[in-house]
């Protein structure tokens, strides 16, 4: 027999509990209204942006263009009456133009039609360009409302995380408690309804006393405080820190201005329709994917064995990580990433940063224990082509995904690393090969790689080797090969993409580094040349990564600038590159000769490299023809790097600028980078970024301390 509980609360108590939960729900609805309001503001500002940009273009088209097709339009009469451009004509009606003596109503209509067509075509080609160096009222309005939208969206997400816990039970309790809102309702309710109301009151009181309401109120308080502090400058500053987040939000609201309205990205529609139905969860991914990246993940998951050939800078690594997260959420446990040794550390760091799956390095002295750890626990084994011979996998083990980065490394079918990698691939039903190289330029290489993924398609395209850019060829390889260019998917083209390239030192580099640390005194200049100070740069992990970046840049029609603080480093690099490199720029080169070197570099073909001391070539020179910047070691003052990057990243630059900072893990590079990052974060909390760059540096005393700490670490390691 169930004991009935006695009602120990008043009707006013019940109404109070209901009121508290109703207020929380009311606030949630208000936040949704705020979100909708900010979206409307963004749409309104974007329309103004589109209008102004369109008028700017039309103002540059002289009225003489009306007669390009020899239509008999008397453009001199238009100029006489003050109509000098298409914009002037757009502002007035057909009736106004027809009042000009010598222009009939029919010609006036023709003039307006020509301008209207030009206006429509112009609008279709305009995309939103958010540039910190060229702020307009419209772009500032867009940035401000996007920042506010992000804030309220984050608020709603945080509240929902709390609100969704036991939400159905709570909703039912709130319905049941309404029985106790007043005397007459209680009087005419059944005994069962009264019992449910009593139990519901106790449950809801328990929820409130557990901090449910306080947690939500604290989140709301923090969000309101942030909302009140969001100024134009704050919003722009946040945009520079995380443009991907802003553009991802805008892509959902104004896709026509971001270039996100086209989900096909060059694939046949039959494949697209299937891919778009792919359903998966990205819980555990710690970043926002752009729409084209989400589509890439769909493609990888649906097609199962693919070669992703996106251009450098589009985030192939992020798409691979997101795919592994999606598969982990479907129950997969073991993943493998095979990559060149030069990017192994980078892969481990990216995985740690962007997802909650554990990366396990299977390389170097700990490769055996790392391999066993991965077998036992699962996660993402990150290894090199050379180490794949170690992977003797049990027949029963199936990997969720094998990722092969820089897949052109296995283009030689007779090489050991090719056969070892192919053997690994037999343990997975899903394969992702990645390369930034345009394989259309080397069909034999493409066929060999595709043959591993899909022999049937490889056999089909053998007969099409002479037509790599023909529609039939593209349609044939579409199920297995997918390549997008930046201009295809990033209409806003983020102008500066910065990458930290972490390199793992080999034995000779480590020996040289320890030798430098062991010397008496504070020889920090010698220590800072880590990896570059080996006798032969073929033993340098930084040089190896540098050569890979240069090759990728050449494939994409780019030129490269390399900066180092040290003359010895740039001399070694120049010798290594040979004819690919211009004459070096250092402090002894006269300004006139510097310009002559740069002029020669400007007119050179893709793949050309300019090597310069950062203090000599880092200021006062314009080198817009280069769009890849490599910095050989971290500088002790961020402004030095900023000024160097600005040689290429400036007005007149027509391409994204890709910046690569070459760094060695577990060395002075890591210590300097960490300290500068901390100082920058502290300084940015109280000052603007330009001021921070000029005022932050590591002084000689700090360098001395870093060296002593490195020496202590070396002794402990040995």
Regions of interest found by a model, annotated:
Residues 29-55, 127, 141-149, 153-171, ...:
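Charged, low-complexity
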Residues 329-334, 349, 353-359, 376-377, ...:
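Conserved P-loop NTPase motor "coupling/switch" region that bridges the ATPase
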Residues 636-645, 649-718:
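A conserved SF2-helicase RecA2
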Residues 389-393, 441-443, 570-574, 595, ...:
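SF2 helicase motor core recognition
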Residues 414, 447-450, 456-459, 465-558, ...:
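Interdomain linker/hinge connecting the two RecA-like lobes of the SF2 helicase core
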Residues 307-314, 319-350, 427-430:
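Conserved SF1/SF2 helicase motif Ia
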Residues 71, 101-105:
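Small-residue hinge/turn detector
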Residues 367-372, 559-563, 571-572, 579-617:
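Conserved helicase ATPase core of P-loop NTP-dependent helicases/translocases
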């Amino acid at each position: 027999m169930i004991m009935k509980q006695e009602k120990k609360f008043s009707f006013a108590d019940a109404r109070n509990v209901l009121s508290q939960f109703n207020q929380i729900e009311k606030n949630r609805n208000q936040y949704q209204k705020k979100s909708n309001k900010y979206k409307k503001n963004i749409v309104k500002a974007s329309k103004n942006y589109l209008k102004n940009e369109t008028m700017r273009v039309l103002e540059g088209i002289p009225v003489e263009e009306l007669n390009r097709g020899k239509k008999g339009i008397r453009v001199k009469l238009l100029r006489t009456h003050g109509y000098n451009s298409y914009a002037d004509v757009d502002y007035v009606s057909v009736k106004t133009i027809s009042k000009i003596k010598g222009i009939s109503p029919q010609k006036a209509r023709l003039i307006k039609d020509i301008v209207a067509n030009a206006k429509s075509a112009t609008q279709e080609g305009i995309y939103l360009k958010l540039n910190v160096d060229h702020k307009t009222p419209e772009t500032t309005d867009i940035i401000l409302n996007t920042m506010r939208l992000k804030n309220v969206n984050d608020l709603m997400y945080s509240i929902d995380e709390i609100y969704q816990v036991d939400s159905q039970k709570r909703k039912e309790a709130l319905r049941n408690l309404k029985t106790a809102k007043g005397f007459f309702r209680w009087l005419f309710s059944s005994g069962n309804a009264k019992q449910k109301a009593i139990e519901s009151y106790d449950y809801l009181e328990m929820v409130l006393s557990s901090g449910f309401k306080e947690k939500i109120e604290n989140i709301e308080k923090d969000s309101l405080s942030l909302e009140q502090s969001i100024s134009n400058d704050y919003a722009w500053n946040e945009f520079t820190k995380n443009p991907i987040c802003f553009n991802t939000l805008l892509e959902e609201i104004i896709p026509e201005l971001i270039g996100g309205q086209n989900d096909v990205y060059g694939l046949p529609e039959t494949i697209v329709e299937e891919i778009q139905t792919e359903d998966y969860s990205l819980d555990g991914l710690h970043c926002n994917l752009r729409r084209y990246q989400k589509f890439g993940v769909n493609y990888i998951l649906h097609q199962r064995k693919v070669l992703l050939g996106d251009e450098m800078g589009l985030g192939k690594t992020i798409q691979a990580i997101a795919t592994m997260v999606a598969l982990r959420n479907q129950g997969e446990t073991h993943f493998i990433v095979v990559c060149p040794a030069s990017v192994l550390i980078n892969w481990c760091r990216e995985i740690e940063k962007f997802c909650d799956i554990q990366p396990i390095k299977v390389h170097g002295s700990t490769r055996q224990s790392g391999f066993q750890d991965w077998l036992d626990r699962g996660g993402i084994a990150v290894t090199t082509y050379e180490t794949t011979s170690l992977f003797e996998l049990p027949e029963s083990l199936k990997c969720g995904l094998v990722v092969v980065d820089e897949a052109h490394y296995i283009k030689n079918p007779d090489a050991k690393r090719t056969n070892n990698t192919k053997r690994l691939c037999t343990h997975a039903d899903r394969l992702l090969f990645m390369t930034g190289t345009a394989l259309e330029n080397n069909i034999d290489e493409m066929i060999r790689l595709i043959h591993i993924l899909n022999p049937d398609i490889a056999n089909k395209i053998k007969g099409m080797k002479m037509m790599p850019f023909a529609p039939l060829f593209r349609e044939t390889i579409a199920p297995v090969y997918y390549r997008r260019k930046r201009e295809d998917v990033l209409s806003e083209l983020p102008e500066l993409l910065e990458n930290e390239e972490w390199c793992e030192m080999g034995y000779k580099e480590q020996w040289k580094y320890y030798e430098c640390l062991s010397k008496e005194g504070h020889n920090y200049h010698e220590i800072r040349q880590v990896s570059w100070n080996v006798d032969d740069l073929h033993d340098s992990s930084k040089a190896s990564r540098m050569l890979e970046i240069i090759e990728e840049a050449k494939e994409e029609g780019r030129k490269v600038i390399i900066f180092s603080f040290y003359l010895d480093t740039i001399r070694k690099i120049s010798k290594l590159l040979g004819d690919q490199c211009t004459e070096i720029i250092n402090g002894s080169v006269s300004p006139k000769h510097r310009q002559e070197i740069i002029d020669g570099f400007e007119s050179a073909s893709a793949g050309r490299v300019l090597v310069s001391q950062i203090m000599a070539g880092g200021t006062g020179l314009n080198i817009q023809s280069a769009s890849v910047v490599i910095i050989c070691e971290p500088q002790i003052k961020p402004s030095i790097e900023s000024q160097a990057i600005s040689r290429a990243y400036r007005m007149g630059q027509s391409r994204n600028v890709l910046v690569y900072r070459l760094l060695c893990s577990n060395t002075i590079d890591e210590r300097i980078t960490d300290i500068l990052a901390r100082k920058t974060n502290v300084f940015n909390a109280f000052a603007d970024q330009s001021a921070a760059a000029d005022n932050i540096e590591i002084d000689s005393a700090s360098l001395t301390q870093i060296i002593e700490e490195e020496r202590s670490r070396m002794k402990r390691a040995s």
